Amino acid sequence: MGASAFYRTRWTTLDARATAGVTPLAGLAAWGEAVHQHHDGGRNSDYVTLAAGLEPVRGLALTGSARLGSAVPAPSVLTDTAQDLRDYQATLAFNRSRLGLQAGWARTSAFTPFGYAEYLRIPSIGPVAETEWVTVGARIAPVRWITLEGWYSNPREGVPEGLPPTHSQTAVTLRSKFLRQFPSGIFDLKLRLSMEAWGDGVIGRDATGDPVRLNGATFFRSLVQIQLQSFSLYWDRWNLSATDLTYVPGFRIPAYGSSFGVRWEFLN
């Protein structure tokens, strides 16, 4: 159990929270949090979060959570008011060393989001209705040095603005320590190739209030990472297919963009 109270900002003068958790049986846990926030202008955010997890057998887990109440999304905007929260989520997962499977369901309550100030071409996002989401994922490691993994998420009905439908990501990772050459295990090589894709949707609204179309796209990304004891380096490249498509209009993703870095830790 725990409790806290803070003065956050001039717009949130009180942030009080109380938490409690319990593990009555092996493989069963529950947790809860109650939040009260007082905002400038006499506004309040009051909600509770409840979560529980059950592991009936080794590797199999069932988890669920709910968030109920009301919250002010942007306290610094004096005209913003509290919106109802009715969010639910449930996940069934199976994880072992060579295989992992996951299926999830979520329902998010209706809300009116704010646009992002840094995206001038998308000044606003339309109201979002109550939405149900289905997410599935898998991980397969046929041998110790190779891993195939991916996930897929899509709303069951309708397409909310700001989030792409049929969103997925898949990746293959090769990893080896070259134990014959480095029996101490100080060497680690990681090669990763991933693909992210989404379908057609609506990213937001323009200055006139008309929907801004989001075209479906596919992007490829690679990562090379080498570690030798406390010395490591990486080379990350994205948009390997040099596509002109993007996620936010006006923010072009460079073709064959790269970033690299070196890290060396040592003690004197």
Segments and roles (model prediction):
Residues 1, 22-29, 54-62, 94-100, ...:
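Short loop/turn motifs that connect adjacent beta-strands in outer-membrane beta-barrel proteins
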Residues 3-5, 30-34, 52, 62-66, ...:
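Membrane-embedded beta-strand positions of outer-membrane beta-barrel proteins
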Residues 3-11, 22, 34-40, 66-74, ...:
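Transmembrane beta-strands of outer-membrane beta-barrel pores
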Residues 4-7, 35-40, 73-90, 116-126, ...:
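Extracellular loop and loop/strand-boundary signature of outer-membrane beta-barrel proteins
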Residues 10-16, 44-48, 82-88, 95-97, ...:
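Residues that define the transmembrane beta-barrel architecture of outer-membrane proteins
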Residues 153-166, 170-221:
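C-terminal beta-barrel architecture of Gram-negative outer-membrane proteins
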Residues 172, 254-268:
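Outer-membrane beta-barrel "beta-signal"
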Residues 230-259:
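Predominantly the C-terminal beta-signal and adjacent terminal strand-loop region
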